């Protein structure tokens, strides 16, 4: 499915992409192959606008929502419902998403007496990247997980789901949290 998305974007839109990794149930497609983050793991502040310009140049006028629609329609052609999210540089496509994963973990934790209230959910992709389209980490907020605590280690400006607390500091903030739990 990811290869088909990659080919469709190239042939029909002239948009060069690269599949940066692929797992049995998930892949990540680099939408801005010319844009090197220079070792930065997190979405950079100017990437969303830069991607919007790239998409428009290639005839994807409605932006990221249209791109996600292309991914979902491609999955349907293979008889597979896929979930697609984006952090600007990468289109993430899978047969499940972070919502599914969080809910499965919480079900398993329940047997150990661990509830969502005992959990915290950390990420760097909560920010709204288009109107009412949030980054992939926002999918961790589900009906089952909403009683937990949500933290964003990205310092990028923008709206986030109401439950998310912005801490910034990148990976170091998360590592400090883990060390303090020991």
Task: Indicate where each model-derived feature is located.
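Active-site phosphate-binding/coordination module
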Residues: 1-25
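Generic structural signal of hydrophobic/aromatic residues within well-ordered alpha-helices
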Residues: 6, 51, 55, 67, ...
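Mg2+-dependent phosphoryl-transfer enzymes with acidic/Ser/Thr/Gly-rich catalytic loops
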Residues: 95, 99-182
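Short, conserved catalytic or adaptor-binding loops enriched in Gly and charged residues
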Residues: 8, 72-77, 142-144
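Conserved acidic, metal-coordinating active-site core of Asp-based
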Residues: 16-120, 127-131
